[in-house]
Amino acid sequence: KDAVYDGNEHKWIPTVTDKADKKLKAGTDYTVEYSTSDFTNVGTIKVTITGKGNYTGTVTRTYKITPKSVTVTAEDKTKVFGETDPKLTAKVAGTLGNDTVEYKLSRETGEAAGKYEITVKGDKLQGNYTVTYVAGTLTITSQSIDPGTDPEKPNPDYTGAKVNSPSDAVYDGKEHKW
């Protein structure tokens, strides 16, 4: 009778027999009443079977639709020291259709090169789901040092444009070839 939420209806239709193990007919020999009209979502459903006509007595049974398990996993991220943090994201596994679960992501404080935990938090029970949260890691790598330009060997900006011998050149004391 019990079922795990799967987006489908789980309406239990009881089979009723008398003491001689004769199968009784719904509507003629007994009636069935349910405590709800929602047979899809998580909850406890009470079923009341009442004798009718030649049969008397009432029997009550309950069954449950229990939450489906969902996992939210923070995705690992990397950045170089001094850069802004990447956007924190997570993957959700186990929801059905367009269903969503709510959660918040944050990371352990710190900016030095190293590893920092990315935490994901939210309610454990969300509607039709029981949610498990899995942390990720932000790795901050060391920044490489830029040696810059050697002052003895200047690195002029090249534009790629062809230079012709200029007619208005001024002698600056250095040799120039065209």
What is the role of each PLM region?
Residues K1-W178:
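Solvent-exposed beta-strand/loop surfaces, strongest in extracytoplasmic domains of secreted
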